C-alpha cells in the first residue's frame, strides 16, 4: 500500500493519495482544487487515478473532484446520505472499493456533517480483517474532532449533529484497533475545530489516550463540550459547503477568465464603480505605497480565511500584486470558491508611478514610540476575544477583525487610532479597512502585541475608553 499526504498550509488542509503498488490503481481522498500535483505524482509513480473520494462536503475549501473527474476520467464517490448536482457513486456503510491488494471501505460517520464518512484502508496481504489506516475527514482530527455547528442553514442543529458525532466516535471509530493510523483532513490552524494538533499522523491508541473529545463521558456531556467555545466560522464556509454539491466551472476555467491585465485608469474607474480592490503584498510594502482605498490581505498569511471573511463573493474583485504572483492569487481565491476576479493592475505598483494622486500610505508606529503621540489615543486590538483575554495592552479595546467592518462606528473619529494584532499581519488588514472607510488618523502597530510585550511598554498616553 502506498500513501502520500499533501498539505496546504494556507488552508491547513490535508489530502491523500492511496495506491496499490501491484495494480498501480490510485484513489485521491479529499483533493484540493488545483489537482496537477496529484496527476504529476501519479504519473511519476506509474499510477492511474481511478477513484476520487470526498469524506463530506467541505466548508472551508472547494474540493477538486470535478477537476480530477474531467482531467483523468476518475469516478467520484460520496457517502450514501449525500445529494449533489453532479454524478457520483454512493458509498453505503461497508461499501468497498477494490484497488488490488489494497481495499478501501466506507464507514458512515455523520456528525461534522450529515453525510460524512471515514475511509478505512486495508492491506489484504498483511491483515485483511483490520484496517491499516483510516482517513477520517473532519470527523476525527489529531487532538480534536470536527465542529458540529456549520450546518444550521440546512435545518440540522449543532445539538443533533453533536449527538451523531458522539455515536460515530463511540460506536464506530473507537471500536477499531489502537494501532490503526489516523489521517485527518485538517491540521493546526483550521477553523473546522477548536484545538487541532500540528501532528501529521497518529494512531487511534494515542488519540484514545490524549484527545480530549475521546475521553469517557456521557453523550450529553460530549454535546456540551463540543458545542462550546468554537471559533467563529468565516463567512464563506456556508457558501463553499453548498458549492461543493453543485456543478461548477473547473479551476482552469476560472483562472483563464480572471487573468486580464488592466491599466490604471480602468482599475480606478472600476474601483469608483464599487469593484473590490485587494492588494496582496506584504504589510510593509503596502504601508509604503498603495492604490487609495484598496484592501490589504497579504498572500503570504492566512489569505483564504481573511479573503473569504472580508470580501463579497458577489462583487467583482481586482488584484494588485507583483505580476508573477497574480495567478497564485487567482488560484487561492478559486480554492475557496471565489470566481469573481475581473483582472489585475498591469505591472502592479509600477503602474502608479505616474499617478501619484492615486497613491496612499499607511502610517506605522513602533511599540517604543507610541508614547510620543500627543493627544487622545484609541488602541484597537483586532485579535480574537480569547487572544485578548490571554493578555492585552492595558486600556485597549477588543474589536476582532472579523467584526470590525460592522463596528467601525464604535471607534472615535477624533484623535489617533492604533490597530494591532499578534504579529502584524491582521492589523494591516484592519488599518486598510479603516482607511477605506474614510478614517485617516490610523496607525498600524508594527510587530503587534508581540513587539509590545518584547519591549515591555506601558500605556502612558490618554487611551480612549469605548464600548467593547
What are these model-derived regions, one by one?
Residues 1-48, 119-137, 143:
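Conserved beta-strand hairpin/beta-sheet module of binuclear metal-dependent hydrolase folds
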Residues 18, 30, 56, 68, ...:
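Divalent metal-coordination and catalytic microenvironments
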Residues 24, 103, 113-232:
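Metallo-beta-lactamase
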Residues 28-29, 49-58, 77-81, 108-111, ...:
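Active-site neighborhood of phospho(di)ester-bond hydrolases with catalytic His/Asp-centered motifs
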Residues 31-32, 57, 81, 113, ...:
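Active-site metal-binding loops of divalent metal-dependent hydrolases
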Residues 33-77:
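Active-site metal-binding motif and surrounding structural segment of the metallo-beta-lactamase
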Residues 36, 57-62, 83-86, 114-115, ...:
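Active-site environment of divalent metal-dependent phosphoester hydrolases
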Residues 147-149, 155, 206-242, 246-248, ...:
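Rhodanese-like catalytic fold shared by cysteine-dependent sulfurtransferases
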Amino acid at each position: 500500500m502506498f500513501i502520500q499526504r499533501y498539505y496546504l498550509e494556507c488552508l491547513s488542509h490535508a489530502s491523500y493519495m492511496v495506491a496499490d503498488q501491484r495494480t498501480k490503481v490510485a484513489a485521491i481522498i479529499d483533493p484540493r482544487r488545483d489537482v496537477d500535483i496529484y496527476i504529476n505524482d501519479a504519473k511519476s509513480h506509474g499510477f492511474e487515478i481511478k477513484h476520487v473520494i470526498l469524506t463530506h462536503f467541505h466548508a472551508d475549501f472547494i474540493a477538486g473532484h470535478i477537476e480530477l473527474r474531467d482531467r483523468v476520467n476518475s469516478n467520484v464517490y460520496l457517502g450514501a446520505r449525500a445529494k449533489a448536482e453532479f454524478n457520483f457513486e454512493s458509498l453505503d456503510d461497508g461499501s468497498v472499493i477494490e484497488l488490488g491488494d489494497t481495499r478501501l471501505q466506507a464507514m458512515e460517520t455523520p456528525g461534522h456533517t450529515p453525510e460524512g464518512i471515514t475511509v478505512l484502508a486495508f492491506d489484504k496481504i498483511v491483515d485483511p480483517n483490520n484496517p491499516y489506516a483510516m482517513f477520517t475527514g473532519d470527523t476525527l482530527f489529531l487532538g480534536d474532532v470536527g465542529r458540529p455547528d456549520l450546518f444550521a442553514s440546512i435545518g440540522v442543529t449543532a445539538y443533533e449533529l453533536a449527538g451523531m458525532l458522539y455515536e460515530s466516535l463511540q460506536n464506530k471509530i473507537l471500536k477499531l484497533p489502537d494501532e490503526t493510523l489516523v489521517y485527518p483532513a485538517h491540521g493546526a490552524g483550521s477553523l473546522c475545530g477548536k484545538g487541532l494538533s500540528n501532528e501529521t499522523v497518529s494512531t487511534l491508541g494515542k488519540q484514545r489516550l490524549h484527545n480530549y473529545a475521546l475521553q469517557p463521558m456521557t453523550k450529553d456531556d460530549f454535546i456540551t463540550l463540543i458545542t462550546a467555545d468554537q471559533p467563529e466560522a468565516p463567512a464563506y464556509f456556508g457558501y463553499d459547503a453548498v458549492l461543493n454539491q453543485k456543478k461548477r466551472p473547473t479551476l482552469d476555467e476560472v483562472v483563464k477568465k480572471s487573468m486580464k491585465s488592466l491599466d490604471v485608469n480602468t482599475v480606478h474607474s472600476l474601483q469608483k464603480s464599487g469593484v473590490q480592490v485587494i492588494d496582496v503584498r506584504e504589510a510593509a510594502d503596502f504601508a509604503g505605497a498603495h492604490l487609495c482605498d484598496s484592501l490589504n490581505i497579504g498572500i503570504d498569511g492566512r489569505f483564504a480565511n481573511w479573503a473569504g471573511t472580508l470580501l463579497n463573493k458577489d462583487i467583482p474583485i481586482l488584484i494588485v500584486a507583483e505580476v508573477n504572483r497574480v495567478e497564485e492569487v487567482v488560484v487561492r481565491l478559486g480554492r475557496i470558491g471565489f470566481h469573481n476576479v475581473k483582472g489585475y493592475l498591469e505591472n502592479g505598483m509600477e503602474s502608479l508611478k505616474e499617478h501619484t494622486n492615486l497613491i496612499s500610505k499607511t502610517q506605522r508606529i513602533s511599540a517604543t514610540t507610541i508614547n510620543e503621540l500627543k493627544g487622545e489615543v484609541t488602541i484597537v486590538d483586532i485579535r480574537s476575544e480569547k487572544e485578548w483575554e490571554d493578555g492585552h495592552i492595558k486600556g485597549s479595546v477588543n474589536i476582532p477583525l472579523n467584526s470590525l467592518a460592522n463596528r467601525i462606528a464604535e471607534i472615535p473619529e477624533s484623535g489617533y487610532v492604533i490597530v494591532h494584532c499578534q504579529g502584524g499581519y491582521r492589523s494591516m488588514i484592519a488599518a486598510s479597512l479603516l482607511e477605506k472607510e474614510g478614517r485617516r488618523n490610523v496607525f498600524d502597530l508594527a510587530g503587534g502585541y508581540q513587539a509590545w510585550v518584547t519591549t515591555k511598554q506601558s500605556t502612558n498616553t490618554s487611551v480612549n475608553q469605548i464600548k467593547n
